[in-house]
Amino acid sequence: VPDQNHVTVIARFTPAADRAPQLRALLEGMIAPTRSEPGCRSYDLYTTETEAPDFVLLERYQDSAALEAHRTTAHYKAYRAQLSDLLAQPVEVSVLRPVNVIG
């Protein structure tokens, strides 16, 4: 039976001019510590196939409590403190709840 309590987050990052390498490094630095969180089901980084690529994080957590726990970690707070200088615009974040999903 699929778990209908999980939470999926899609976060899209548009790097400021000449900041893509630093943004990528910052986002990649979040992968290992986030994946080790007990409530993290997946945490995957993608890039768009556009001339000036954006980065997209596809995150899945066991439930809302796990997402909130993620947002209180030291690595999340350190990442947020460095993020704004690397962006051309604010991060676009969508938090999704399952309606009809497999797994």
What name fits each language-model region?
Residues 7-14, 44-71, 92:
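Short, well-ordered beta-strand segments in beta-rich or mixed alpha/beta enzyme
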Residues 1-7, 45-53, 81-103:
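Glycine-rich beta-strand-turn "strand-cap" elements at beta-sheet edges
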Residues 29-41, 60-94:
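An amphipathic, aromatic/His-enriched active-site/gating alpha helix that lines ligand/cofactor pockets
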Residues 2, 14, 18-21, 52, ...:
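Residues at secondary-structure transition points
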Residues 3-45:
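N-terminal first-folded block
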